[in-house]
From Swiss-Prot:
The keyword Phosphoprotein does not apply. Expressed in roots. InterPro entries: Metalthion_15p. The gene is MT4A. GO terms for molecular function: metal ion binding. Belongs to the metallothionein superfamily. Type 15 family. It comes from Oryza sativa subsp. japonica (Rice). Induction: By iron deficiency in roots. Metallothioneins have a high content of cysteine residues that bind various heavy metals. Keywords: Metal-binding, Metal-thiolate cluster. This is Metallothionein-like protein 4A.
Length: 78
């Protein structure tokens, strides 16, 4: 399990790995060929420290790996 609810992880050069920012990929904006935008849903409110326990369970807390603002690794100790 990676930090940020399983969506972000620290990859090479301490940049967040694949899946970063895709907490709810099925709720992303979709566009059609007619250039119309359809919003499929709204995500529920999140707890401020929701990912802290998950990172600790996975052992990433020992490496200092967590995702900060704009899904950047914070601190950069991966």
């Amino acid at each position: 399990m990676s930090c940020c609810g399983g969506s972000c992880n620290c990859g090479s050069s301490c940049k967040c790995g694949s899946g970063c920012g895709n907490m709810y990929p099925d709720l992303a904006e979709k566009t059609t060929n007619t250039s119309a935008t359809m919003v499929l849903g709204v995500a529920p409110a999140k707890e401020q420290f929701e990912g802290v326990g998950k990172a600790a369970e996975s052992g990433e807390a020992a490496h200092g790996c967590s995702c900060g603002s704009s899904c950047k690794c914070n601190p950069c100790n991966c």
